[in-house]
Amino acid sequence: MTMFMACNPTSQLTEEAILIQNVSIIDPVNGLEQNKSVLIDRAKIVRIYEQSQAPELSGVSKIDGTNNYLMPGLWDAHVHYSFDENMRSEMNSLFLKYGITSVRDTGGPMDIVLQVKIASTRAEEISPSIYIAGPLIDGSPNVYNNSSPYYPLLSIENTDIQSIEENMGALVAEDLDFLKAYEMLTEPQFKALMKTANESELRVTGHIPLSMNLFSAVDNGLKGMEHLRNLEMSVAQNADELQEQRLEMLQNQEGLSGGALRSSIHAAQRMEAIAQLDSSKLLAAATLLAEEGVWQTPTLALYNNFATKEYLEDSAVEKLRVLPAEVSIAWSEAMKMSGSEIDPSTIAYVEWMRETVGYLNQNEVPFMAGTDTPIGFLIPGISLHRELELLVQSGLSNLEAIEAATIEPARFLGVERHTSRILEGYEADLILLRENPLENISATKEIEKVIKSGKVVPIEEF
């Protein structure tokens, strides 16, 4: 941008310029500001005016924002493009249709996720911004090993330190935005992973390895946790005893698959740990997570869906119409086969998750909003709005939930200085809402327009 343009941003506007007039803006840091006009051009927010001082700008496309609310486009910070190949080509349009303009892919084969990311940057593509972790970095036996449709190939198996070092060397040479550590890693493998990641300045999120506890994982540099996974085992009164038991079970004398072995350990320890929670250890964990800035992406919508069988409700079944026909049929059949019986222990686990989210938030632990779509019958886009509702029900304020779906994922990825805020010079990834989400978080579903890279997305065609 020339100096003249910088001083007078309306002097060199392109034919793609848009002026959103008389709108209330919701910035995740500054909150609500009313009576504004927002000028967009060249994929950026060029100028924010007081409505009374906004120029006429003849020839510029105008959007009447009266009684509307403009906020940054949403993030889904936990998605998997490679989980269902029949869904992959439809995910971008569904994300945009429901106001998700950026996503974090949290695990899949490099050849798939890298191509998805590359395709998203092509000029002719209308796509969310896509940030990728590459494959789940797992131990042996790895969980997502293509053993069934429920366990497609999302991970790489590491049998020893040498394989970790070799695989990490290859991964950090790729165009990755972060890394994801998984549950079957040994402690030495995890430490080797973190050493290479730290040297490469790549943040690592993941599941606390079953061989470890939360405190050791964070001390070694873990910067994110997905699903609160295995936190409860680290804050039980008998946490040390549970860890010794896990190390014994991880010897895998029965030769179980990675998925079966992990499930057996969860079944043996998860509810026992919750029943014997040590409040002092939980406080110590919350304090450490806050001090080290370890982001939590709890994916409450996923676990709530499993626990309550919410996906069997008529309103949820009706939403399947937005999916490709093949996927809609497959999901409908799988939903029916799952039955309608509610498992009390699963309900109890979800209640613990929600209580823990509220507790961690009170202790200033940072959060991101993510869903795990398309796993668990979670429709891309729609499911993120349910996640926001559940975050608020768990104790986050409406603004904190908005932060979790905007600026916090940007901060995790180090892009917060140019996206996910309503500020001049920031990317014009925006959603225009008919209602105020600060009053009712469900208003994020009341989408009037979606703007991606400064262009209005034709969501009515999706």
Map each language-model feature to its residues.
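Divalent metal-dependent hydrolysis catalytic cores, especially in the metallo-beta-lactamase
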Residues: 92-113, 127-134, 173-184, 202-205, ...
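C-terminal motif of bacterial Sec signal peptides marking the signal peptidase cleavage site
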Residues: 5-6
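Acidic, glycine-enriched loop/beta-strand segments at the rims
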Residues: 25-37, 51, 379-382, 397-402, ...
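Active-site neighborhoods of metal-dependent hydrolases
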Residues: 167-177, 231-389, 394
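Active-site mouth loops of central-metabolism enzymes
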Residues: 75-86, 146-163
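Histidine-rich, glycine-flanked metal-binding segment
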Residues: 11-17, 25, 29-71
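Divalent metal-coordination and catalytic microenvironments
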Residues: 23, 38, 43, 67, ...
